[in-house]
A protein has these predicted regions:
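Single conserved hydrophobic/aromatic residue that forms the stacking wall/gate
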Residues: 435-446
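Cytosolic regulatory regions of ion transport systems
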Residues: 1-437
Length: 446
């Protein structure tokens, strides 16, 4: 597809890299010649220096005939205007990044009235991701599939886990184990697969069955009632608002006095402390060792790493760190900090998923596609037509390909987590997992 990206910052470059590597014809627009030169040296893309709200520049970039224009400059207003102009020129789809909290309540109106395909807010997306992780303290990651209707929870088995040494068919649970990561490899397991301590497994089921599974297998995380947030930026604001609305105790540490005053005004139910959250003495004075969770959200990766390691050392139940450089992920993992969030990656992945769905929905029934397990597994949702070869046949009688799993069936708005006796019917939407070595297409049974 022909894609134009306006803005070559962290997020713009990430999108350019992913989309060009997937074979799309990408043109990047930015006013900074030095940044564009770097991108042009690294990636096989067209680079155009200029202003994204210039009709002449947009036309030169091919916005009039592109399949998608993505505006991710540092200014919300520029992104919105850029998409409006691109639509007028003839761009089929447009996506704008809008980050200002003042626009948050107007996002739906902006998207609908201006004819945008999608609006993204990396800070809000990151806050939502953190909030989900705090709901399930044992989870390292939570993926939402099938347009948010199916949850995939990822967690690590300890060496003494009651699941270690057990084959999946021996698990007396309605939870479906979808993927297992072990020693750098990712597997879609069958019933004979034996779990080991240290495995990172992803499961899906109804919330009730997941809770029961965690209880019976001893995977119990302390319910989080209090959260300490270090840093008072946009993510902290969105997260604190979500937590306060859920009735949790929230304490925010921020060193900028004006920002503290603003947060106190916007978040009356949160306790806002004016102080340096990287000061370990202050952290202890504010009862770090008594809080259920700490989230490090300063503007500096190094501070977030140190704060998170300090909290882990003091056995805080759940520790989450924001990092912009994913190379720090391994360092934190070795230090016992399992959970990290990278805002620009979260939103970039949403856009990449949108692009993949655009590309793969052209005539083959695929409605959405998400990559899991470090990109080794694809989750595909497809609509079942009457001509589908496996209609009305129980899953246990199907000769499914190895490395292929039917994770859920959506029928009449209801999610079914299938057993062997369930069958696929015409009109269903089916969520399947397939190893990336297999070609991306609607399910073939054998």
């Amino acid at each position: 597809m022909k894609i134009v990206i306006v803005g070559d910052g962290k997020m713009g470059f990430t999108l350019t890299r992913h989309l060009s590597e997937e074979g799309h014809d990408v043109t990047v627009i930015d006013h900074n010649a030095e940044i564009l030169e770097r991108t042009g040296d690294i990636l096989d893309v067209a680079c155009l220096r200029g202003d994204g709200i210039s009709l002449a520049v947009l036309a030169e970039a091919g916005a009039d005939e592109c399949d998608l224009l993505i505006a991710v400059t540092s200014r919300d207003e520029v992104n919105i205007i850029c998409c409006m102009l691109a639509r007028k020129l003839g761009a089929r789809h447009t996506i704008a990044r809008v980050r200002n909290p003042e626009y948050a309540k107007s996002l739906f109106f902006i998207r609908e009235e201006l004819g945008l395909s999608m609006l993204i807010n990396p800070e809000m997306d990151a806050a939502t991701e953190i909030f989900r992780l705090l709901r399930f303290p044992t989870a390292l990651k939570i993926d939402f599939l099938a347009k948010g209707r199916v949850e995939l929870l990822t967690f690590r088995l300890t060496a003494d886990s009651p699941l270690a040494g057990k084959a999946l068919h021996a698990l007396k649970s309605r939870v479906l184990v979808c993927t297992v990561q072990r020693d750098g490899a990712v597997y879609i397991p069958d019933g004979d697969f034996v779990l080991q301590g240290g495995d990172t497994i992803s499961v899906t089921a109804s919330p009730k069955d997941v809770a029961a599974f965690f209880h019976t297998t001893g995977i119990r995380g302390q319910k989080i009632k209090s959260v300490m947030i270090v840093g008072g930026g946009k993510i902290s604001f969105y997260l604190a608002r979500l937590l306060c609305e859920s009735g949790l105790q929230v304490k925010i540490l921020e060193k900028d006095k004006e920002r503290c005053d603003l947060l106190s005004e916007l978040l009356p139910r949160a306790m806002v402390i004016c102080g340096d959250g990287s000061d370990q003495t202050l952290l202890m004075e504010e009862d770090l060792d008594r809080t259920d969770a700490l989230v490090a959200l300063t503007n500096m990766d190094e501070e977030n790493v140190i704060i998170s390691m300090f909290a882990t050392l003091h056995e805080v139940g759940k520790v989450i760190a924001k990092i912009n450089h994913i190379s720090l992920d391994k360092i934190l993992e070795k230090s016992g900090v399992d959970c990290t969030v990278t805002p620009h990656l979260i939103s970039s992945n949403q856009i990449v998923q949108y692009v993949r769905a655009m590309q793969n929905s052209r005539g083959n029934g695929v409605e959405s596609m998400v990559r899991l397990g470090s990109g080794a597994v694809e989750a595909l949702e497809f609509h079942v037509k009457e001509s589908f070869e496996a209609c009305d046949v129980s899953l246990k009688t199907l000769a499914l390909k190895k490395e292929l799993l039917i994770a859920s069936i959506i029928r009449g708005g209801k999610v079914i987590y299938p057993t062997g006796s369930d069958c696929i019917r015409a009109g269903d939407n089916v969520l399947s997992l397939i190893h990336i070595s297999e070609p991306t297409r609607p399910i073939s049974i054998s």
